[in-house]
A protein has these predicted regions:
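Ankyrin repeat boundary/linker residues
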Residues: 2-3, 35-36, 87, 99, ...
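Start-of-repeat signature of ankyrin repeats
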Residues: 6, 38, 90, 102, ...
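Ankyrin repeat A-helix N-terminal signature
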Residues: 12-18, 44-69, 95-101, 108-114, ...
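Ankyrin repeat domain, specifically the short helix-to-loop turn at the C-terminus of the second helix
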Residues: 23-31, 74-82, 119-127, 162-173, ...
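Eukaryotic tandem repeat interaction scaffolds
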Residues: 131-147, 152-181
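Leucine-rich solenoid repeat scaffolds
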Residues: 210-253
Length: 254
């Protein structure tokens, strides 16, 4: 039952993409901020809109009704949802190395490179500069930080590039470093996105900042050359080449 799982009827309706039903529940007084599992409806929309959960490739729920997810998001905020609410427990988003705690809906929309939702959230008053508990920025997350399965996680390279451009247009710091030593360039390397690597370089990502080991000893180049993911070593030769092309312009002193 819903009570046994900790789910509310509103969360169950959203989780099945029954947004019209969810809208009726709001009209009947459902709490738009109830988060019995550590995440609220405003967060849940981010992984319902862009499924393809890392490592599972599950399809999105089919849903029903005449109300779409963006229209419902507006209704949710109009009904009193805290648009900058932060996740307190890890949500069911599949394999991901990203610390979801402290994440807002905007940061989680950046995780799936969902620019339409990112724009709507900002239009509705979201703070696009809120970080997670590790001080990872939405820009880092948009670039690919937390990627669990390159090529399987939500967000194509083109979508990620658009999300990165949008985050930068909002004044995100391209040279920010989180408490684990990660940068946006680490994110692009983890997600194996050479075009994003090149774009971050073009936009002023400082080599002296990103060409450093993070807390687990990974530089962007090492990530691209190959790191352990489960039982396998996963690499990306095109991402490796993109990073080397940048490093070759700035040879180390002899």
């Amino acid at each position: 039952s819903a009570a046994q799982t900790g789910m509310t009827p509103l969360l169950l309706a959203i989780g099945s993409a029954h947004f019209e039903t969810a809208s009726v529940l709001l009209d009947l007084g459902a709490n738009p901020n109830a988060a019995p599992l550590g995440w609220a409806p405003i967060h849940q929309i981010t992984w319902i809109r862009k499924a393809g959960q890392a490592g599972s490739n599950n399809p999105a729920p089919q849903g029903s009704g005449k109300i779409g997810s963006l229209e419902f998001t507006k209704k949710l905020v109009e009904s009193g949802a805290d648009i900058n609410a932060k996740v307190t427990k890890r949500p069911p988003v599949g394999v991901s190395d990203l610390n979801m705690r402290g994440g807002t809906a905007f940061l989680l929309a950046a995780r799936t490179a969902d620019v339409d939702l990112m724009r709507l959230l900002v239009d509705l008053g979201a703070d696009p500069h809120e970080t997670n508990d590790d001080l990872s920025t939405p820009l880092m997350v948009a670039a690919g930080l937390g990627t669990g399965a390159p090529g399987e996680d939500p967000g194509t390279e083109e979508e990620v590039l658009e999300a990165v451009k949008y985050a930068l247009s909002l004044g995100e710091d391209i040279n920010a470093v989180d408490v684990l030593g990660n940068t946006a360039m680490h994110g692009a390397a983890y997600k194996h996105l050479p075009l994003v690597v090149a774009y971050l370089d073009e936009q002023g990502a400082e080599i002296s900042i990103w060409n450093q080991e993070n807390e687990i000893g990974h530089t962007p180049l090492l990530i691209a050359e190959g790191i352990h993911r489960g039982m396998n070593i996963v690499s990306s030769s095109v991402t490796e080449m993109a990073i080397k092309n940048i490093l070759d312009r700035f040879p180390l002193p002899q």
